[in-house]
Amino acid sequence: MLSPKRTRFRKQHRGRMKGMSYRGSHICFGRYALQALEPSWITSRQIEAGRRAMTRYARRGGKIWVRIFPDKPVTIRPAETRMGSGKGSPEYWVSVVKPGRILYEMGGVSETVARAAIEIAASKMPIRTQFIIAG
């Protein structure tokens, strides 16, 4: 699972996701990509599940780039705890994804293989996505 090696602060505010992604919205490394169409938090488990599904489908051929990184800690309070007494402890990491953001890229394979592999990865995501081709 992906997570930062160290962070400046243990806990973060939730924040809000408004507007489009103004960075990371163009294909940089591969030829095919999976682009987000909705805003959401994507957990490190979901990112890893999508990556594994793509690599398993593509087998040896091709290369995969993961363009998002979970750098936001999500805290959860223990079960049956009364309100107050501070914020809960960090439980897992998420990546804040806005519409237009590239999630995965793929290269070195045919379009049919890439489309099928990326479609499998898209089914692991909690948001609507689209398959795009560079150029």
Swiss-Prot record:
Any one biological process term the GO annotation gives: mitochondrial translation
GO molecular function term, any single one: structural constituent of ribosome
Subcellular location: Plastid, Chloroplast
Cross-referenced CDD domains: Ribosomal_L16_L10e (cd01433)
Gene3D superfamilies for the chain: Ribosomal protein L10e/L16
Main localization category: plastid
One GO cellular component term noted in the UniProt record for this chain: chloroplast
Record keywords: Chloroplast, Plastid, Ribonucleoprotein, Ribosomal protein
Assembly information from the UniProt record: Part of the 50S ribosomal subunit.
UniProt family annotation: Belongs to the universal ribosomal protein uL16 family.
PANTHER family: 50S/60S RIBOSOMAL PROTEIN L16 (PTHR12220), LARGE RIBOSOMAL SUBUNIT PROTEIN UL16M (PTHR12220:SF13)
Record protein name field: Large ribosomal subunit protein uL16c
Organism encoding this protein: Acorus calamus var. americanus
